[in-house]
Curated annotation (Swiss-Prot):
InterPro entries cross-referenced by the UniProt entry: Ribosomal_bL28 (IPR026569), Ribosomal_bL28/bL31-like_sf (IPR034704), Ribosomal_bL28_bact-type (IPR001383), Ribosomal_bL28_sf (IPR037147)
Family statement: Belongs to the bacterial ribosomal protein bL28 family.
Protein's name according to its UniProt entry: Large ribosomal subunit protein bL28
Gene3D superfamilies associated with the record: Ribosomal protein L28/L24
MF annotations from Gene Ontology: structural constituent of ribosome
GO cellular component, one term: cytosolic large ribosomal subunit
Key word Ribosomal protein present: yes
GO biological process: translation
Gene: rpmB
Annotated organism of origin: Azotobacter vinelandii (strain DJ / ATCC BAA-1303)
Protein origin, superkingdom: Bacteria
Keyword annotations: Ribonucleoprotein, Ribosomal protein
Length: 78
């Protein structure tokens, strides 16, 4: 399974580890993804999403029904 937030689309980005001696080696910065069950009152069921912390804040702000409608419009299976 890919490390991508289902709500925001955030995924890994690349950068450098920089040592005290200023040596640079490539690394990945991973998003803060969590599996979370959201209760959807309109469907009377739980929906399990893989979302970042920012994605959870978006769901808190806009509501799970609005976010699910956008996911389904994108063609994502929920």
């Amino acid at each position: 399974m890919s490390r991508v937030c289902q709500v925001t689309g955030k995924g890994p980005v690349t950068g450098n580890n920089i040592s005290h001696a200023n040596n640079k080696t490539r690394r990945r910065f991973l998003p803060n993804l969590q599996h979370h069950r959201f209760w959807v009152e309109s469907e009377k069921r739980f929906v399990r999403l893989r979302v970042s912390a920012k994605g959870m804040r978006i769901i808190d702000k806009r509501g799970i029904d609005v976010v699910l409608a956008e996911l389904r419009a994108r063609g994502e299976k929920v």
